[in-house]
Amino acid sequence: MKKEFKAIADIIPKNISVLDVGCGDGSLMNLLIKEKNIKARGLEIKEEYVKKCISRGLSVIEGDAETELHQFPDQSFDFVILSQTLQAFYNPEKVLKDLLRVGKSAIVSIPNFGYWKVRTSLLFFGKMPVTKTLPNNWYDTPNLHMCTIKDLFNFCSDKNIKINKVIGLNENRTSEIKKSNLERKNLFSKIGIFWLG
């Protein structure tokens, strides 16, 4: 199991409804159904992933979150999850607002562009980094709006979006991020997981 999925599962209560936006092959939904007995639905843009989810018995619809989330009623899910997809949207602010409208809470995870290995790659090699969490070259990446944990933390503050908890992940550990340790955790976390709303 991916460490990120475990950290997300630790936040999600049992027996609730979850919309997984950009659900990919449905691995996270499958985990949450098994471990948390959730009622899950997915929204995925790639047809091959939608077919894979459906073949696994998962409830998934094909669509683009930027154009389809408006069709979901307000507060229609207990949680809405957006796992490592925020940076791929043309208008991430609109998507975040829709997540928080559709769900009572949202979990958003991001690859952290402030991670020390990313910074080092830019500093010493002078080129866009390729890592496990940022696996594409600059010319074939779906990422449009790279940000750091600190950027998203500050964005939420500026837009009055309530942050319930922020978790940082790296190779060896999972740790909570607060204002008091934000600078250090922004440097040493590969992934940031935000529980919002």
Set out the residue ranges of the language-model regions:
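Alpha-helix C-terminal capping/helix-to-coil transition sites in glycosyltransferase folds
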Residues: 14, 75-76, 102
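Class I SAM-dependent methyltransferase SAM/SAH-binding core
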Residues: 27-68
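Conserved class I S-adenosyl-L-methionine
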Residues: 16-24
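Short conserved loop adjoining the S-adenosyl-L-methionine
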Residues: 68-74
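Conserved alpha-helix/loop element of class I SAM-dependent methyltransferases that forms part
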Residues: 1-15
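A short SAM/SAH-binding and catalytic strip from SAM-dependent methyltransferases
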Residues: 79-91
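S-adenosyl-L-methionine-dependent methyltransferase catalytic module, highlighting the catalytic core
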Residues: 93-98, 105-197
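Structural signature of beta-strand start/N-cap positions in the alpha/beta core
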Residues: 17, 39, 76-78
